[in-house]
């Protein structure tokens, strides 16, 4: 639910409710603006440069391969936990500081997540210290959240992640009627259940945020480095792993990360910049780091 959707649905009763009783702020997403980076940050309290989890796919030195961190698997598969026999999760994921800090203050943290992936190997490390609760539907989650708040005798922190708007954006696009229908349904449910969730005299601070926004990507105009004839020969710049296998590009459609031979960085940048002029920026990772794109601190994990 990025800013474009706020502008589109700002007259919805639930958005109007939030505006009347709270504040609506426009936030800048971290870079890269992707689920893996932001879900990790909100659960650990660590920015991208410290957590090391910066994209859906990236090279992980512990396994010498490109992985899908949220799945705890090698890239190129939708199967979960293909890395389980290869490496321990704690060696891949960061230990968070957020939930331990809450518990020291006497606040018990809970995390509500879709049953398809709650709990998960990723969550066992990144969300360590929080009690996980799974749900099938949003209405179920909201009712269970309300019951939890009603029964709690001590301060609690609850995090509820709803992924269906994002999922339909990926499948149909952000302007598709299917996506808009899902957003409308979400806002109707929130308005219907809001008072029921937060009834009573307990003091509750409510925050709704998006991990990132959504932008259109047209497959028909996408440039594929491994297919387009203008990029023939580019493979000579690609770095290989310890077994001599080329490291496939990581990242996603709008922020592609290339793993290149150290001695070919300048040549590769010139090669790509010339062919992508006016279509994409080609920059070295060290420039992004120096400009603070990944946060003020860079850890060895990154």
Where are these regions (language model features)?
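Short gly/pro-enriched beta-turn/loop segments at secondary-structure junctions
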Residues: 153, 199-203, 249-253
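A long, amphipathic alpha-helix that forms part
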Residues: 165-206
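Histidine-centered active-site microenvironments of extracellular/periplasmic hydrolases
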Residues: 212-253, 302
């Amino acid at each position: 639910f990025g800013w474009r959707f706020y502008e589109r649905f700002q007259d919805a009763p639930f958005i109007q409710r939030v505006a009347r009783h709270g504040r609506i702020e426009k936030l800048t997403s971290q870079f890269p603006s992707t689920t893996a980076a932001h879900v990790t940050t909100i659960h650990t309290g660590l920015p991208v440069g410290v957590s090391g989890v910066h994209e859906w796919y990236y090279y992980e030195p512990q396994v010498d391969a490109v992985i899908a961190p949220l799945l705890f698997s090698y890239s190129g598969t939708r199967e979960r936990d293909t890395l389980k026999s290869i490496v321990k999760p704690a060696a891949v994921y960061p230990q968070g500081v957020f939930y331990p800090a809450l518990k020291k203050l006497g606040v018990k943290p809970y995390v509500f997540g879709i049953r398809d992936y709650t709990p998960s190997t990723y969550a066992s490390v990144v969300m360590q210290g929080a009690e996980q609760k799974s749900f099938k539907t949003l209405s179920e989650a909201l009712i269970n959240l309300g019951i939890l708040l009603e029964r709690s005798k001590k301060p609690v922190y609850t995090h509820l992640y709803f992924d269906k708007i994002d999922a339909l954006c990926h499948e149909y696009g952000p302007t598709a009627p299917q996506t808009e229908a899902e957003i409308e349904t979400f806002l109707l449910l929130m308005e219907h259940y809001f008072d029921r969730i937060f009834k009573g005299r307990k003091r509750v601070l409510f925050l709704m945020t998006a991990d990132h926004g959504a932008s259109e990507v047209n497959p028909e105009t996408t440039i594929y480095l491994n297919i387009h004839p203008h990029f023939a020969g580019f493979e000579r710049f690609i770095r290989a792993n310890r077994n001599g296998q080329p490291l496939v590009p990581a990242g996603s459609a709008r922020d592609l990360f290339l793993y290149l031979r150290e001695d070919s960085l300048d040549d590769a940048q010139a090669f790509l910049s010339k062919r992508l002029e006016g279509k994409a920026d080609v920059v070295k990772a060290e420039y992004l780091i120096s400009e603070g794109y990944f946060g003020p601190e860079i850890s060895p994990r990154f």
